[in-house]
Curated annotation (Swiss-Prot):
Protein name: Probable cysteine protease ATG4
Gene that encodes it: ATG4
Domain of life: Eukaryota
Pfam families: Peptidase_C54 (PF03416)
Organism: Pichia angusta (Yeast)
Keywords, comma-separated and alphabetical: Autophagy, Cytoplasm, Hydrolase, Nucleus, Protease, Protein transport, Thiol protease, Transport
Phylogenetic classification of the source organism: Eukaryota, Fungi, Dikarya, Ascomycota, Saccharomycotina
Length: 509
């Protein structure tokens, strides 16, 4: 009886969540990853839906009417995007001893929990894997564009071997190059994430970076990650240049465009990034959850929602049968359910509802593509953009580090450390773009020790005129600075590549 009630409740939630979204904007152009579509003429006025249909499945003619309100070519483009979602029933991901429990109220409601394995680990990512799934979607669509071109369209009646191969790299088994198992493993290695813990943009980006490098022979794709939004040409070229040409490289920018919401100052530039031909979408951008954003209309962003539990995407493992881990093997069908990674359901979110923490993806296929991207970035007003291109990292020389190790960083120019205290769900390494305009510097700075210095040095902290004052009352000036221990900075910040800042202001502008 209880099981039947849960299934009924799950069906109701699924119906409400899965309802078609009609087009109600016939003025603004539709944009999908660099392609634009006319909104089309408004349909005839329709009656409001009967609320009595709430507990009934959507009728085919109703779905057709909703679908008809969107331009056909726009729908074909959306339907061709690879859509990776929650899955259940995949090979076990072992639980960490001090990690989250696979059993939760949400998993019971969704009906995705496997009670037979719940004490051992996870066989579903429902409730915690949305950032992984949207990052997989971003990467999968990058590979789709790289191998099949932006004009390719999914056709259910025709089999495309390259498309099927790309999807097979993301199936839910440990041996697939970009499976959730490998993302979880790299999340632990790169960001200390335990199975069942929610990823942020930085953990997702670093996982993509490591996995793409490990599987470069398959993908032919390099990954450049910036946690500040700043792209340094010398580093990018060192990573991807081959002679006079540039090999394909995926630029990932882990950024935060506000404290609780996206600052309206960045709205225009955010939409422009989705309109560039190099755009492969945005992962993140919803409080305590993540979506894959692929386009916009007016001030609304279109997205694919990963919060739709489906049966695990499985194909036969290529691992040798003498593998010591029996969890690598499950009973699977020989075919690949390609239809389950595509949808034509349209969802959109207003920019003022978007979470400011996100991962922006840009695919550079060659040198001409990079030059065009650089021009697009530089043509926008610097005060309202969150991406910048520099020849190289600026340099700051220091006589002593006061005992800092080479891997430790000091962040200069933050208005108040309390800005970071307010960001509970901020992923490590993604906060450096916060309040860029009010900061003396926008990057973590590596301060190197001068080997010529004597052993006894002044290790005290000295503040310059740009140092942040936490107390505005001048009478309490002696209480205005907080002491920040190294252990605290390590727990709050995950350093990106070392950044050095020059006294020459022209180098940073």
């Amino acid at each position: 009886m209880a099981s039947h009630s849960l299934n009924t409740l799950h069906t109701v939630f699924e119906y409400i969540w899965d309802r078609e979204l009609p087009n109600d904007d016939f003025t603004n152009t539709l944009t999908v990853l660099g392609r634009t579509y006319a909104p089309g003429p408004p349909p005839h006025q329709e009656k409001a839906p009967d609320l009595r249909t709430l507990f009934h499945k959507f009728k085919p003619d109703q779905a057709a009417d909703t679908e008809a309100s969107w331009p056909r070519e726009f729908l074909r483009d959306v339907h061709s995007r690879i859509w990776l979602t929650y899955r259940s029933g995949f090979p076990l991901i072992k639980r960490a001893e001090d990690g989250p429990s696979p059993l939760s109220f949400g998993s019971l409601i969704r009906g995705t929990v496997d009670l037979a394995t719940v004490t051992k680990g996870f066989t579903t990512d429902a409730g915690w894997g949305c950032m992984i799934r949207t990052s997989q979607s971003l990467l999968a669509n990058s590979l789709l564009q790289l191998r099949l071109g932006r004009g390719w369209r999914y056709d259910q009646t025709r089999e495309c071997a390259k498309h099927a191969e790309i999807v097979s790299w993301f199936v839910d088994i440990p041996t697939a190059p970009f499976s959730i198992h490998n993302f979880v493993e790299q999340g632990a290695n790169c960001a200390g994430k335990k199975p069942g813990e929610w990823f942020g943009p930085s953990a997702a980006a670093r996982s993509i970076q490591v996995l793409c490098e490990a599987n470069y022979d398959k993908t032919g794709l390099k990954v450049y990650f910036t946690a500040s939004g700043d792209i340094y040409e010398d580093e990018l070229f060192e990573l991807a240049q081959q002679g006079a040409e540039l090999r394909p490289v995926l630029i990932l920018a882990g950024i935060r465009l506000g404290v609780k919401n996206v600052n309206p100052l960045y709205w225009d530039f955010l939409k422009k990034t989705l309109g560039w031909p190099q755009s492969v979408g945005i992962a993140g951008g919803r409080p305590s959850s993540s979506h894959y954003f692929f386009g916009f209309q007016g001030d609304y962003l279109f997205y694919l929602d990963p919060h739709v539990p489906q049966k695990a995407l499985l194909i036969a493992s290529e691992a040798p049968h003498e593998s010591p881990d029996p969890n690598h093997y499950v009973e699977v069908e020989s075919g690949l359910d390609l239809d389950s990674v595509h949808t034509n359901k349209i969802r959109k979110l207003h920019l003022d509802q978007m979470d400011p923490s996100m991962l922006v993806g840009l695919l550079v296929e060659n040198r001409a593509s990079y030059d065009a991207l650089k021009h697009s970035i530089n043509s926008h007003d610097q005060g309202s953009r969150f991406l910048n291109v520099y020849d190289s990292r600026p340099v700051l020389a220091a006589k002593s580090s006061g005992g800092l190790e080479e891997s430790e960083f000091v962040d200069l120019g933050v208005l108040s450390m309390n800005e970071y205290d307010a960001i509970d769900d901020c992923d490590v390494g993604t906060c450096s773009a916060l309040l860029r305009k009010e900061r003396a510097f926008s990057h973590p700075v590596l301060v190197a020790m001068d080997p010529e210095e004597p052993e006894e040095i002044d290790a005290s902290i000295h503040f310059d005129k740009d140092a942040s004052i936490l107390e505005k009352d001048p009478d309490r000036a002696n209480e205005t600075f907080e002491e920040i221990h190294v252990s605290e900075t390590e727990s709050r910040f995950e350093p990106d590549e070392p950044v050095v800042v020059s006294h020459d202001s022209a180098a940073v502008m």
